[in-house]
Amino acid sequence: MATTSFDANFCAERLKAIGDPHRLKIISALRYGEMTVTDLAELIEAENMTVSHHLKILKYAKVVEVRREGRFMYYRLHEDLVGADSQKSMFLDLGCCRLEVPDRKA
């Protein structure tokens, strides 16, 4: 039997974490840089509380990371996951697969 070089349970948890329309919108928005909850809520047309809930799930799955500046929290895609190919397409390397993050401006 072949062995795998990745943690299937961890990968499944990450896939579950990104498998929500709000979270996919957040990931797409963060492609352009860090944002606050308020910025994200306005951009994806959701309530601040909803965005905070989804960011907590993404943070727990290590898809996003956060930094504090004064009283503001800035969220960004986890730097260990972000990559780009030769066509300047951005992706998240989840360890078991890659998620291409579409350019919403296109």
Regions found by a protein language model. Name each.
Residues 1-6, 10, 79-106:
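Amphipathic alpha-helical dimerization/coiled-coil segments
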Residues 28, 53-56:
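Base-recognition residues in the alpha-helical recognition helix of bacterial helix-turn-helix
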Residues 2, 9-47, 72-82:
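N-terminal helix-turn-helix DNA-binding core of bacterial DNA-binding proteins
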Residues 50:
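Residues in the helix-turn-helix
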Residues 42, 59-60:
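Alpha-helical residues within the helix-turn-helix
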Residues 16, 56-59:
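A general lysine-centric signal
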Residues 60-69, 76-77:
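Beta-hairpin "wing" of winged helix-turn-helix
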